[in-house]
Amino acid sequence: MPQANLTLSPHDQQVLDSIFNPLELSSLQTNNLIPAESDLKDEEPDTQAIKASRELELKAIALSESGELDGALELFQQSLNLAQRASVLNNRAQTLRLAKRDEEALDDLNKALELANDQQTRTKCHAHCQRGVLYRKLDNLEAARADFEAAAQLGSKFAREQLVEINPYAALCNQMLRQAFDQLK
């Protein structure tokens, strides 16, 4: 089997990097500027209403994870009645998606992103990812790309992977590479 010389010139490497990593420039070290997703936090005031809302939200998440979607949605609503919080809307959107109620989920994600402030980067990141997935499902790739770019800038690895998947140049390059490797076999 012939061996291919896979040494790339710096220019070729930069072209491939710009295709496969659209948010990173190989000539710049942007990785240090983008936080890791695990470092993202939500900071909220420590009021009684928010504490009670958070407790209901956690119970709703547990119900949702166990498949009790209707009960979870009721608890999310009770949580929102105590305090309008972006995190609750984001998590309720996830449950609505599981219940195949995508339009309602999209409404909640829009509201979550309106409510989220600069101290709620985790919720913002997750809401952008979820909304990007919904837009992608609806074939609105431009809106999906915008949400994935916002989430990637906040540190989401998932969003960066989605950007590569919806990048037409990356798809074309993958196809060409697949053909080249098939010819080498």
UniProtKB/Swiss-Prot annotation:
GO process annotations (BP): tyrosine metabolic process
InterPro entries (alphabetical): TPR-like_helical_dom_sf, TPR_rpt, TTC36
TPR repeats: 53-86, 88-119, 125-158
A family per Pfam: TPR_8
SMART domains: TPR (SM00028)
Keywords: Repeat, TPR repeat
Domain of life: Eukaryota
Family matches, as Gene3D superfamilies: Tetratricopeptide repeat domain
Membership in a protein family: Belongs to the TTC36 family.
Protein name listed in UniProt: Tetratricopeptide repeat protein 36 homolog
